[in-house]
């Protein structure tokens, strides 16, 4: 077959299709011999004739839903803006006034509320104030017991190291060791008196130099504690 067969077949197909749309209106894309091709003249004319009919509020297309559905016409939706505009300045002024009032309240009451805040270091440390019992965690107690097993008395440097390691204060470490020493002495005193009673002719034991040093150090610690308070 020659190529002319395909050309003639396609041409006949398009001409047959065009016969179906003989009554269709020419659009801006049609290229009739008498059509104007300068600018957008034909296109503007085609759309100008259809747009008013579709988007006109007064057309029957829009009148029928208003009348049948709500019993209202198109005029009910064309409300004037004056009734709303006259309330806007007052509304805006009220909102601005409320915001200003709130800002003034924050400025006035902010420092007053901040002044009522009491931090731990601001609390009074008078003799009338009752101190709560310090509670130690299991880990802190275990570490303190291990330290007490090796050293019943701590130097200032070692006390600071333990305080930093256990997240405690030097005062808490000091008080814990004081209480632990008193408990240890009481336990050993009871153990020494429990087995046998002291004979009547027995000479009272003389305190050793170590016991005296311990007592003097305890007295010094108590004096330091009173001075700190």
UniProtKB/Swiss-Prot annotation:
One of its GO terms (biological process) is stem cell differentiation. Residues 129-188 bind DNA. The keyword Transcription regulation applies. A motif (Antp-type hexapeptide) lies at residues 118-123. GO terms for cellular component: nuclear membrane; nucleoplasm; nucleus. It is found in: Nucleus. Keywords: Developmental protein, DNA-binding, Homeobox, Nucleus, Transcription, Transcription regulation. Residues 213-229 have a biased composition (Acidic residues). The keyword Nucleus applies. SUPFAM superfamilies: Homeodomain-like. It comes from the Eukaryota. One of its GO terms (molecular function) is DNA-binding transcription activator activity, RNA polymerase II-specific. SMART domains: HOX (SM00389). Pfam families: Homeodomain. Residues 186-229 are annotated as: Disordered. PROSITE patterns: ANTENNAPEDIA (PS00032), HOMEOBOX_1 (PS00027), HOMEOBOX_2 (PS50071). Sequence-specific transcription factor which is part of a developmental regulatory system that provides cells with specific positional identities on the anterior-posterior axis. Belongs to the Antp homeobox family. This is Homeobox protein Hox-A7. The gene is Hoxa7.
